[in-house]
Amino acid sequence: MRKGRCFVPSFFAPWFFVPFVVPFLVRSFFVPFLVLSPSFLVLEAQPAQPGRVDTLRAVGGLPPETCNVFREPLAFRQIASGTYFVFDRRAHAVFSVPSSGGPPTKIVEIGGEDGRLLEPTAFDVAPDGTFAVADAPRGQERLQIFDPTGKWIAGFFLPGRAQTRISVGGLGMGGVSTVAFLGRGIALNQPETGSLITEYGLSGTPVRSIGMLRATGHENDRQLHLAMNTGVPLPHPSGGYYFVFLAGSPVFRRYDAKGRLLFERVMQGRELDPVLEQMPKQWPRRTIDGAEFPLVVPTVRTAAVDPKGNLWVAFLTPYTYVFDENGEKTRSVEFRGAGILAPSSLSFGPRGRLLVTPGCYEFAGY
């Protein structure tokens, strides 16, 4: 070794570091480029991983001092003027709330006569702000139409006695409780007629029937068969309906404006697996006015259609599935207000907000 020079072992030569430096450079520079660069947008657009649940957090809603007025807000709607409507089932009333969220005004009150409510079960609003309420004074199903101020416009009774085919939380579901208000008419689920959907004019005259009942395997038990064909008709923005079955196998159908079946889809997902596993093979019975009826608990709690025609279905478990116009599931969602919500109603307001009860919350980014 010459004087004035030091010896450098071979493992300190530059080539020695190549196996260590290259992976570091790839991880530090190349991989982030794949994820963030516009050149690789295909990677960003990959569908959500199976089992992923998106959490939507409330961005607004009615203030607590307003919500505390209501006993059981079962529906929360907003019309183009910004006014909110709250349907309070336990108070047998409908309230209007200014867009500022100020004190509510009771615009429809309790009572059995025309223009009042007794044992109400459902509520729906047309785009022009007129609304329909279903109730059952003295056990007879009735539908009433009101203007945005609560003034009575029309109403009629349906023949026969009200029958609860499905119940959850003390609320009976079926018949008038499945009302969809069309503005110039009303759509109901009445499986006892042999069809899934019956449209009525505002005078109470049947206009047309849509959809055949589904096979349930319980055709020999008429009441159970009808319960498994209980569901909600949901008008589609382009015409026709979605129909969501509330009990039994979770299924929905899509009908066009002429009433023709376009498709049927079975709703599946890991969030539903525990519910389906616990579904009874034999349903318990109960006696009402001397007649026996099956005690059926729903799988689906509520459903709604957004302005783009996507179907949102909320289950008894605190999860909601979203399906596109072709019936394909695109999202699994949970709602968070003060805590995780199990929606009892969903609606889409005129300002791009999703309105949810309980809690009268608003969500953005749907």
Protein language model features and the residues they cover:
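Bacterial N-terminal signal peptides
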Residues: 19, 23-40
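Eukaryotic scaffold repeat domains enriched in small/polar residues
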Residues: 45-366
